[in-house]
């Protein structure tokens, strides 16, 4: 897996967590 892709997934997960929280 590309590092950039992992960073992107991490950012998306943080956004989802902040929105659903």
From Swiss-Prot:
<comment type="function">
    <text>Possible increased expression of this protein (due to mutations upstream of the start codon) is proposed to be responsible for resistance to 3-hydroxypropionic acid (3-HP).</text>
</comment>
<protein>
    <recommendedName>
        <fullName>Protein IroK</fullName>
    </recommendedName>
</protein>
